[in-house]
Amino acid sequence: MHPNADVLQGTLDLLILRTIALEPMHGWAIAQRIQQISDELLRVQQGSLYPALHRLEHQGWITAEWGASENNRRARFYALTKAGRKQVDTEVAKWERLSAGVNLVLQRT
């Protein structure tokens, strides 16, 4: 995958929810963590990240609170809600079904 490749459409919610499952994080840190964990294969652009964070907050899956980042800048920290924790399981199951389907097509064609 090209180093500047954006995240596959439809997977961003899953990646964000999984990334903040262990601890609240601010937007830039979420994008950096996804990039780091994926060995630089996935990059989340700000133009995709912040609308997704707002959508997830509107759906009640995450909350946002103002705090200080590691360099003492004011930032919004995003955390999973109880509903968000349930949604992680739903999103993982959807991804596993989709991935299995794609693998079948790749193997049988």
Task: Give a label for each model feature.
Residues H2-A5, W66-G67:
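Short beta-strand/turn micro-motifs at beta-sheet edges
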Residues N4-D6, G60, T109:
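Short, contiguous hydrophobic alpha-helices characteristic of membrane insertion segments
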Residues N4-S48:
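N-terminal helix-turn-helix DNA-binding core of bacterial DNA-binding proteins
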Residues L49-L56:
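Basic amphipathic alpha-helical segments that dock to polyanions
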Residues E57-R74, A79:
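Beta-hairpin "wing" of winged helix-turn-helix
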Residues L80-G84:
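Accessory beta->alpha helical hairpin/"wing" motif in late/C-terminal subdomains of nucleic-acid enzymes
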Residues K86-T109:
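Amphipathic alpha-helical dimerization/coiled-coil segments
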